[in-house]
């Protein structure tokens, strides 16, 4: 090996003939040559070597990238160990997919122009500055350079579903194969079908090349135009070193350091596999960080970000150690067992790739559990607030009389295994507390808690779906509480938490209610049905207010033809409290949908039949309840009211009316007067009749 000529890829490094090179760490030594510039120029032989080719690959592995750039195993190990800083088109080596679930196809254009070499018969007689060689750590000298240029067009899809990666990659590859077929003429165009056009519009392009471009291509169309121009830009003046031939320094200076040995192929393969495995974990972490659910849960986002930083630090430390070992092996100070031991130690550490992937599996499961719950919860259209300060500000809003909050109780940024990884980074010689994450440390690794969380999410959604209440607001948040597994539905009344495991509202007997706040829970917002309104009734304010005035509309089969009445859209599917603001003569109550609409008989008049119950107020008759044509006067403690509450407890079969001077949404605890309690045997709809104005 000490006397072997080396052939290495230039990788964008500024090689010149006669330059010195240290093959032990693959570094150029600028500022020194073996010969004077005049001698080098006189001894240089140049020959033309024109060629061009293109290649398309659908792989992002370091092996395939190295193959495209003709990088041999030893230099590849140096690159992976961080010894080589690449430039120009070789920056393509650093371009890695951001996401694991992402399709990538690369198009390479490669051209060569000429080859320059130094005649080796120069020997030692022309060597200059030999007295400085003792302090110059160079093992080789550059005696040949092949010039040319490389260009890489890297096409990436957006992040896709894991099941579609290969399919999309195949579609991309088929389209990109058409680019080299473009004629080198004035205009560049590729004939694409509409489907292929859609495909090209969905992926991006990144360019790495040895060509100077005024602007780099970012789209498929840009790439076609740029690819067409590359051959015209090629020439000796624009060429850069691509491949370099190196002769050992001992041929010119016997005391020069030598490249004594190199690692075997199996060991170099371990270097590649170990570092690429960490890259795969990092891409997997990027996939998770890009999930919209993670953006909601800052604690999960923090864990993933910390994990990513820890992996980056581990990668940097591992690369630095690999670089030292490679230099020691190539200098003859250590044998390749030094690298073997390094990777054995890595396998016995918490940073073994099996443990890192296991942690990602746990974290992906947590994300999936949270996502499945959020998919259910969002159907309730709650306010999603993961900032506790903002949440309690919302709960203190005077409009929020009642708050139901679905709380994720075990989402935390704390993680025992991340602590182990961090501690091991700081003290790699210490004995780690554990080598891999344990399922018992993660609540979501078992099915019972996630299943319970989904059940509560369905309950929360159903509660929100059933209620149309201006006083009850729905929220979703995350508050860490180890005492409550998974999640809970917390109930707040006027910003005070009352229940931490809410299932359904408890309504006391209507006679026992002493606080109007107990009724506010059932306050609901209904809209009037224009299809049922008598022709002289006009609806406004989003069909929540009605007054008299002729409507110009077509007749409806469902409208009341004789009596000035209107029904609500919503049926009474549970126990709502309807708040009616009144002025003048008002009749309000409940009726069955089957009430007659077209006759002038009592069958069509609210309160005059067995299908309806009504509370009525007129200045002439005062207060009275009406059912089946029977009027019963009602005595109240104060005359006049602004709000009529109609409370139907269908499961209990009761109907109650309340009157008051304040709205039912008012914060005052004063309870309106209960003026009627009747019994119902079936499920009615809301209905009202009026001689003046009515609104809810």
From Swiss-Prot:
List, alphabetically, the PROSITE patterns matched: B302_SPRY (PS50188)
Q: Which InterPro entries match?
A: B30.2/SPRY (IPR001870), B30.2/SPRY_sf (IPR043136), ConA-like_dom_sf (IPR013320), Cytolytic_pore-forming_toxin (IPR052090), PRY (IPR006574), SNTX_MACPF/CDC-like_dom (IPR056072), SPRY_dom (IPR003877), Stonustoxin-like_helical (IPR048997)
Q: Give the main location.
A: secreted
Tissue specificity, per the record, is: Expressed by the venom gland.
Superkingdom, according to UniProt? Eukaryota
Q: Which residues form the B30.2/SPRY domain?
A: 506-696
Q: What does UniProt say on post-translational modification here? A: Glycosylated.
> Where is the protein found, in the record's own terms?
Secreted
Gene Ontology process terms (BP): killing of cells of another organism
Tell me its family: Belongs to the SNTX/VTX toxin family.
Q: Which function does this protein serve? A: This lethal (towards mice) toxin induces hemolytic, cytolytic and hypotensive activities. Inhibits calcium channels and may activate ATP-sensitive potassium channels in frog atrial heart muscle. In guinea-pig ventricular myocytes, it modulates calcium channel activity through the beta-adrenoceptor-cAMP-PKA pathway (ADRB).
Q: What is annotated about its quaternary structure and interactions? A: Tetramer composed of 2 alpha and 2 beta subunits.
Give the protein name, as stated in the record.
Answer: Verrucotoxin subunit beta
What organism, scientifically named, is this protein from? Synanceia verrucosa
């Amino acid at each position: 090996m000490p006397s072997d000529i080396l052939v290495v890829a230039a990788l964008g490094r500024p090689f010149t003939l006669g330059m010195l090179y240290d093959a032990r760490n693959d570094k150029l030594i600028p500022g020194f040559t073996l010969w004077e510039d005049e001698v080098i120029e006189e001894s240089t032989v140049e020959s033309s070597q024109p060629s061009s080719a293109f290649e398309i690959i659908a792989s992002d592995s370091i092996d395939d990238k190295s193959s495209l750039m003709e990088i041999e195993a030893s230099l590849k190990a140096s690159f992976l160990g961080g010894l080589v800083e690449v430039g120009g088109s070789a920056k393509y080596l650093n371009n890695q997919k951001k996401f694991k679930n992402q399709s990538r196809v690369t198009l390479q254009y490669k051209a060569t122009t000429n080859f320059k070499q130094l005649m080796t018969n120069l020997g030692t007689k022309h060597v200059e500055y030999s007295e400085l060689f003792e302090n110059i750590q160079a093992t080789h000298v550059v005696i040949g350079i092949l010039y040319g240029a490389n260009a890489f067009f890297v096409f990436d899809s957006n992040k896709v579903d894991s099941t579609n990666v290969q399919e999309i990659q195949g579609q991309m590859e088929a389209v990109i194969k058409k680019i080299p077929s473009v004629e080198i003429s004035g205009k560049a165009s590729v004939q694409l079908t509409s489907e292929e056009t859609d495909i090209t519009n969905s992926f991006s392009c990144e360019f790495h090349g040895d060509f100077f471009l005024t602007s780099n291509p970012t789209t498929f169309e840009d790439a076609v135009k740029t690819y067409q121009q590359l051959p015209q830009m090629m020439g000796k003046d624009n060429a850069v070193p691509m491949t370099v031939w190196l002769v050992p320094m001992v041929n010119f200076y016997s005391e020069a350091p030598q490249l004594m040995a190199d690692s075997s192929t199996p060991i170099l393969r371990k270097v590649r596999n170990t570092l690429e495995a960490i890259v795969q974990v990092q891409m997997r972490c990027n996939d998770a960080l890009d999930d919209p659910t993670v953006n909601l849960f800052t604690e999960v986002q923090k864990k993933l970000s910390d994990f990513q930083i820890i992996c980056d630090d581990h990668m940097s430390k591992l690369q630095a150690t690999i670089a030292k070992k490679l230099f020691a092996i190539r200098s003859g100070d250590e044998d390749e067992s030094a690298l073997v031991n390094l990777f054995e130690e890595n396998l016995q550490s918490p940073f073994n790739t099996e443990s890192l992937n296991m942690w990602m599996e746990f974290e992906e499961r947590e994300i999936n559990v949270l996502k499945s719950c959020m998919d259910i919860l969002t159907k309730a259209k709650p306010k999603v607030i993961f900032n506790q300060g903002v949440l309690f500000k919302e709960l203190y809003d005077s409009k929020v009389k009642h708050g139901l909050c679905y709380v994720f109780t075990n989402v935390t940024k704390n993680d025992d295994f991340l602590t182990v990884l961090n501690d091991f980074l700081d003290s790699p010689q210490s004995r780690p507390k554990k080598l891999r994450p344990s399922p018992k440390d993660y609540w979501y690794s078992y099915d019972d808690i996630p299943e319970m969380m989904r059940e509560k999410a369905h309950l929360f959604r159903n509660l929100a779906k059933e209620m149309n209440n201006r006083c009850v607001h729905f929220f979703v948040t995350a508050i860490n509480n180890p005492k409550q597994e998974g999640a809970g539905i917390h109930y707040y009344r006027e910003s005070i938490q009352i229940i931490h495991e809410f299932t359904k509202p408890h309504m006391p007997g209507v006679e026992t209610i002493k606080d109007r706040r107990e009724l506010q829970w059932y306050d609901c917002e209904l809209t009037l049905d224009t299809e049922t309104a008598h022709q002289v009734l006009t609806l406004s304010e989003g069909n929540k207010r009605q007054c008299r005035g002729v409507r110009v509309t077509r007749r409806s089969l469902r409208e009341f033809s004789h009596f000035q009445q209107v029904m609500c859209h919503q049926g009474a599917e549970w126990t709502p409290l309807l708040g009616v603001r009144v002025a003048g003569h008002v009749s309000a109550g409940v009726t069955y949908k089957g009430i007659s609409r077209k006759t002038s008989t009592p069958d069509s008049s609210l309160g005059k039949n067995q299908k309806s119950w009504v509370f009525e107020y007129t200045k002439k008759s005062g207060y009275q309840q009406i059912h089946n044509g029977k009027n019963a006067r009602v005595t109240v403690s104060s005359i006049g009211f602004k709000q009529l509450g109609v409370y139907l407890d269908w499961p209990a079969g009761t109907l109650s009316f309340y009157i008051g001077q304040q709205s039912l949404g008012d914060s005052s605890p004063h309870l309106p007067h209960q003026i009627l309690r009747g019994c119902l045997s079936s499920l009615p709809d809301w209905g009202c009749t009026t001689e003046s104005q009515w609104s809810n």
